């Protein structure tokens, strides 16, 4: 019985000493966080999409608080979040232009010629390295295997009739779809763009039209 009591006392004392040690070390190595950084982080949406160019919302908040990034750096939050962060930082925020992703290809299954019927893994990066880069005759257009769909954290892009189509209402212009497209067909453009180029082929006119009826 005495052995159990001694063991309990030893464990308790050890725990107490470790607690005191950790408390002292915590105070000694404590790094004070800028209150502005905390306030800015509270206003950011928390998607951690990386569309701002930083690793996540924590990194962006730190950069904004340090003056290394503008108050309107978050593409997801847009103008409302930029205004709140600007107030925290005591700076005037310029007008934020809403952006959206855009797929530079209109060659869906009805318009683009198919060389063969494909059945297999649905991944654009993998298919881009095989001969002809997929089933479509055009080697520049959207393959339609959905790598961009998987990358989008906002469910803002879908494969419709063989090509990627962006839902502008849901798109936050984070750029993740841009990064994963092996043919670099997706770009970020102003939401209210009046003119777009819906073809990315570098072939000559006759070859373009023989592969896709809406090629240019």
Feature roles, as predicted:
Residues 2-216:
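Ferredoxin-type iron-sulfur electron-transfer modules and their immediate structural context
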């Amino acid at each position: 019985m005495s052995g159990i009591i001694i063991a309990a006392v030893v464990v308790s004392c050890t725990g107490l000493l470790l607690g005191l040690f950790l408390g002292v070390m915590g105070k000694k190595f404590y790094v004070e966080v800028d209150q502005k950084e905390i306030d800015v982080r509270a206003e950011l949406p928390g998607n951690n999409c990386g569309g701002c160019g930083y690793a996540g919302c924590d990194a962006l908040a730190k950069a904004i608080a340090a003056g290394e990034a503008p108050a309107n750096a978050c593409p997801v939050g847009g103008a409302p979040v930029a205004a709140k962060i600007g107030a925290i930082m005591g700076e005037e925020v310029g007008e934020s232009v809403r952006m959206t992703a855009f797929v530079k290809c209109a060659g869906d299954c009805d318009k683009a010629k198919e060389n063969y019927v494909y059945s297999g893994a649905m991944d654009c990066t993998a298919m881009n390295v095989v001969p002809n880069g997929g089933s479509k005759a055009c080697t520049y257009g959207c393959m339609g295997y959905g790598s961009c769909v998987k990358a989008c954290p906002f469910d803002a892009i879908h494969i419709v009739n063989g090509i990627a189509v962006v839902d502008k209402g849901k798109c936050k212009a984070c750029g993740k779809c841009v990064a994963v497209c092996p043919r670099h067909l997706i770009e970020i453009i102003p939401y209210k763009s009046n003119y777009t180029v819906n073809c990315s082929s570098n072939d000559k006119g006759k070859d373009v039209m023989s592969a896709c009826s809406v090629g240019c």
